C-alpha cells in the first residue's frame, strides 16, 4: 500500500512521461539488477532527448543455484525449478503489482514492462493470467482496468506456445494465456544467434532460442506474430504488421556481445545505448489500436 500510494502521488505531479516496470532474469543479484536498470533508463533517456521522464519500478529476485561459478550443464538441469519459480512469481507478487499498480495507473501514464530471460516469463504470467492470490480474501475478484502499452522481453525464457490452445509437447510450458493476453497491447520479443543460454535448454521451446525463432516464424508469422529483425543501431529492419500482438525480432546484430561478468554468450547484452534507442523508438510510437496525438506531458 505504501508503494501504491507513493507512485500515485508521484504520478499526480505530472512530472513523469512513462511508468516503467522492469524485472531481470535469474542469477541477477539486486546490486547488479539496479545497475542494469540504470543502464536501460540512461540509454532510453539519451535516445529520447528529454522526452523520457520515467517513474521507474524495479523488481529484483534471485533463484536457487544463482552463483556465477556454476557449470552451464548444472544450470541447464536447474531449469525446471527456475521456470516454476518464475511462473510462481508471476502468479503471486509480480501479478499483484501488475493488478494493483501498473494496470490502474496505465490509464493516466503510458506504461511499459522491460524484462529479460526468466523475468519475461514472470511478467507475462503476471499480465496474461494475473495473480492467483489476493491480499483481501474477503473482497470479490475484480478485473482491474487498463492495459500495458508494451512489454519488452529480451531473450525470453518462455514458450510462445502459451498463446496457442494446441496440446503442448514440451515440459514446463503447460500454461495457456487466455484472451490473447488482452491486458497487454503489444509484446516485443528478441532472440539472437549469439545467445548460448537459451540454446542450451533442449526440453523447452524458449522464445529466446534462435532456432525456435526460425521454426516458429515459418509456421506462424502473420497469424500469431509478426517476425522481422533489428539492426545494430536499434532500428527495426524491413516492415512488420503492427496489428499483431507479438512482434518477434531477430536481434542478432544488436544482441551480440558478452556482457562483462556474465556467461551464456550474448544472453545479457541488453544494456548498451543501442538497446535503449530500440526501446525508445517503439514506445515513442503508439501501440496497436491506439492513437496518440501528442506526447505525454
Where are these regions (language model features)?
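Extracytoplasmic/secreted envelope proteins and their assembly/folding machinery
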Residues: 3-8, 34-41, 91, 95-98, ...
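Short, surface-exposed "cap/lid" segments of acyl-processing enzymes
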Residues: 6-68
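Short, low-complexity, polybasic intrinsically disordered segments
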Residues: 10, 122, 126-130
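Soluble non-cytosolic domains of exported or imported proteins
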Residues: 17, 30-35, 80-92, 117
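Short hydrophobic segments within beta-strands
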Residues: 22-23, 114, 190
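Active-site micro-motifs of SAM-dependent methyltransferase domains
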Residues: 28, 120, 158
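Lipolytic serine-hydrolase domain surface
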Residues: 51, 61-109, 127-297
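Gly/Ala-rich beta-loop-alpha elbow adjacent to hydrolase catalytic centers
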Residues: 114-119, 123
